[in-house]
Regions:
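Small-side-chain structural scaffolding
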Residues: 15-17, 56-62, 67-70, 108-109, ...
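Hydrophobic transmembrane signal anchors and adjacent membrane-proximal interface regions, especially
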Residues: 52, 149, 168, 193, ...
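Acidic/glycine-enriched connector segments
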Residues: 1-216
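Conserved non-transmembrane functional hotspots
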Residues: 221-451, 458-575
Length: 575
């Protein structure tokens, strides 16, 4: 299957909000288009491996202007609607406006989709209609990484209006517009790329038309104040700079590491991106494991060489050379692993894979919940890009039709695949058994090293007593020094080995993995049994089981990532 940039790469999604009645006299129109195009150009230049996608409801004014600039640049756009298409077209004032809308719809990357909203199938009342516009504004705010606002900079109390949507972005979407309201969650906030624009109905503007600023929340102030700073998308002052960088790194890794790899045969972005994330996670997991093993071996050699150099046999000063070489090799491995973020990338991409997998099966059975609302929301800031990336993939899949039979099969396939991974095809040779075996193996080596150290220490005590009582047992007087130094040398070697095995065990986390994997094995076994034994209709049973399993899998994987973040690749401790 050939690559599709919007299915095989994480996109940067650009949203738009703005006035419908823009003053588009020729000089204003030109400067607004130039400013919007400059944002697109900067994103395309700074993130060359990352596709751009515009979300625009194609309302009159700002929505259409930005869509036209995107189309001229070859940037695809999709059209989320606040209500069914026929009802939405009624809001356009003239036949020319409706024709312009239809023309832009034809050029969209996919047909328009109506966002989920609490409305009946009938034409909504005026108050409900305003709420629908607020809902689509909230959808764009939550789905986009870059929000462009063509706004005059003046506040106005209008539900679903431009100023309202900007408030959503800077201070968080109100609870009534969230699919999963929670008083405990931090509000999801972000910057607004504000281009000052004039309105026909009100010529006042806060700044000159075309003036560009980035609007961000000012945490130092109380109330609903925000700062206006003059930066560009991706600059260090942009709160989403790390998000853009991580998305670009993922796409660059895909191009570099998986070049020529066939894509998964599906039209689902979450499924195809999950497969990509799994391959990249495995690649970096192998590199991180190799780095840790090399550090272990190099540190062991360095410790042994130093012990020999400082040991009982004289004139072995040349052993300082392999000691320094082994130590230097360990430092090189450490620097390369940390500069390349091998372990962090393995963890990030594995977390991304799990989240995308859960999102895919949720979507498949019609659970239009977003993993981004549940996943890593209260974890470290450096992980925030993962749920945002999953949210982008979820947005891409909103266009897909619902297929009940596929959804039921997808749930069973997911549960069976996860159970087989943890338990093994025969229930004996899965990840749980492998990690438990590794824990036992290295635990035994650690114990034997400690026991050897104890035996050598006891031998040293016996030697000291015997040498004090009857030194003639050891022959020539110089032999006493050799016996003493030799036993001290062996004690040191045993201590180094015990410390290395202990450090390696802690950093690989075999014992903790085995414990967690045992719990996951039980969960997936029970989930499959619940699916088989449920008296509910198949679709309802699948939804019920996968909703609960998905939440548990996300919580467990979030804990797994945090556990490994606390155990970075470091030079192993031998003392």
């Amino acid at each position: 299957v050939s690559e599709d940039p919007l299915l095989d790469r994480l996109p940067i999604i650009i949203g738009v909000t703005g006035h419908r009645d823009l003053d588009l006299r020729p000089d204003y129109d030109r400067v607004l288009r130039d400013r919007v195009d400059a944002i697109f150009a900067r994103l395309a230049r700074d993130f060359p491996n990352t596709p751009l996608l515009l979300l625009t409801p194609l309302a009159e004014g700002a929505d259409r202007l930005v869509a036209e600039v995107a189309r001229a640049r070859g940037i695809p756009y999709r059209v989320p609607l606040p209500m069914p298409l026929a009802q939405y077209r009624e809001d356009f004032r003239t036949e020319d406006s409706r024709a312009a809308f239809d023309g832009l719809v034809v050029g969209a990357e996919t047909p328009p989709y109506t966002i989920p909203r609490p409305l009946s199938g009938e034409a909504p009342a005026s108050g409900e209609r305003a709420a629908s516009y607020a809902m689509v504004g909230a959808h764009i705010v939550r789905s986009s990484h870059v929000l462009i606002a063509l706004w005059n900079g003046l506040p106005i109390d209008k539900i679903g209006g431009t100023a309202d949507v900007i408030q959503f972005r800077v201070f968080g979407v109100p609870q009534q517009y969230l699919p999963k309201p929670s008083l405990l969650d931090e509000p999801e906030v972000g910057p607004v790329h504000h281009i000052c624009a004039a309105r026909l109905s009100d010529p006042r503007v806060a700044r000159p038309v075309g003036a560009y600023t980035l609007l961000v929340r000012d945490d130092a102030k109380t109330g609903r104040d925000f700062d206006a700073i003059d930066v560009r998308p991706g600059d260090s002052a942009d709160p989403f700079a790390l998000l853009y960088a991580r998305i670009e790194a993922f796409n660059r890794d895909r191009s570099r590491i998986l070049a020529g790899t066939a894509a998964v045969e599906t039209t689902s972005a979450t499924s195809r991106l999950s497969a990509t994330a799994e391959r990249l996670a495995s690649h970096y997991q192998r590199k991180a494991k190799s780095a840790l093993t090399r550090l272990f071996v190099a540190t062991a050699i360095a410790g042994l060489m130093f012990a020999i150099y400082a040991g009982p046999v004289p004139k072995l000063h040349l052993f300082v050379v392999p000691y320094l070489l082994a130590l230097g090799f360990a430092v090189i491995v450490f620097v390369r692993a940390n500069r390349g973020r091998w372990q962090d990338r393995a963890q990030d991409y594995r977390a991304l894979e799990i989240g995308l997998n859960v999102q895919h099966v949720w979507d498949a059975v019609g659970l239009r919940e977003s993993v981004a609302d549940y996943y890593l929301g209260r974890q470290r800031t450096e992980l925030e890009w993962i749920p945002k990336a999953i949210g982008a993939a979820h947005t891409l899949d909103l266009r897909l039709p619902f297929d009940e039979q596929y959804g039921i099969a997808a749930v069973r396939g997911f549960l069976s695949e996860q159970y087989a991974y943890f338990a093994g095809p025969d229930g004996k040779k899965g990840a749980t058994a492998r990690e438990a075996a590794r824990s036992r193996r290295f635990g035994a080596l650690r114990r034997w090293a400690f026991r050897a150290g104890f035996v050598f220490s006891a031998a040293l005590i016996v030697f000291a007593i015997a040498a004090g009582i009857k030194p003639a047992l050891f022959g020539a007087p110089e032999n006493l020094s050799l016996w003493h130094d030799g036993l001290v040398f062996l004690i040191g070697v045993a201590a180094i080995a015990a410390a290395l095995f202990n450090d390696y065990l802690e950093r690989r986390g075999f014992e903790e993995h085995a414990r967690r994997y045992e719990l996951m094995t039980g969960m997936y076994r029970r989930a499959l049994a619940a699916l088989d034994e449920s008296e509910l209709p198949p679709l309802e049973a699948a939804r019920s089981v996968i909703a609960e399993v998905g939440h548990e899998a996300l919580a467990e994987n979030g804990d797994w990532v945090l556990m490994h973040r606390a155990l970075p690749i470091e030079l192993l401790q031998v003392g």
